[in-house]
Amino acid sequence: MFIAGIDGGGTHTRIEIRDIENNLLRREEFGPFNINSIGEDAFRKLLREVFASCGEMADCKKICFGAAGISNPRVGEILEEELNAAGFVGKWKRCGDQEIALRGAMDTPGVAVIAGTGSICFGKNEAGETARSGGYGHLIDDGGSGYALGRDVISAAVRALDGRGQGKALLDAVYAQLNASTSAQIVSFVYSPNTDKSAIAEFARIALDQAAAGEETARAILNRGAEELQALVAAVQNRLDLADCPIALLGGLISSENIYRRAVVEKLSELGTPIAPAHDALWGAAQMAYEME
């Protein structure tokens, strides 16, 4: 008998298997989980691979799926169909990636802010009430994210090219990253159907590098991003009455030491106590499976 937690991401899917006494047995990794990116057929194939790796699904007592976009009704239908087909008869649940991230980050009430390609914040108070802010996608939201920083770098570059702003160093760095020399090449890259939000987010590194070198436009971009993440956290705290709580920093942009993380920590210290997560999101998914009633 066993339980399982699944952390489904845009680039890979991870599963943690534990025995029914909550002891870790193993972890495995598979391909991307996002049905919008890979399509329904590939999503079903992924699930079958994951379930096959578990062994006899009839022996699985509980399973928790955590992923962005998992509230999509069609995703729920497919999960149920594939679980049934695999012989699963236990209990299961699905929740957002922010929920498993928070559960992995801390055992106490608090807030987790995630800044990777996108951004989102999620919190839980003593009463068990939860709230989120952000996470509405790169077209209308994702402030403080890698996408937002990358977009602002490219924007500052073309403004500098026109003489509408400083940021000449950013322009040079954008040219170098694209192996380009004209504004037309920048525009062609940005609006190409092959350029997704992850490609734009790669330009966030320019902001970090240039800010570390003292470039003022880059520093301003990072400060705006830190303020956006601060606003995400404040919104959740206000709704949950969670003043001066632990705040876990998660996601590729702020989970390890860099100039942007320092700016974010400075802003978040006005609201609570920034902390490193105790465990990762996959641990959180498996723990939520174990705690399922």
Which functions belong to the PLM regions below?
Residues 71-168:
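Phosphate-binding/catalytic loop of phosphoryl-transfer enzymes
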Residues 1-61, 82-85, 105-111, 154-293:
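ATP-binding/phosphotransfer module of carbohydrate and carboxylate kinases, centering on a glycine-rich
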Residues 68:
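ABC-type ATPase nucleotide-binding domain
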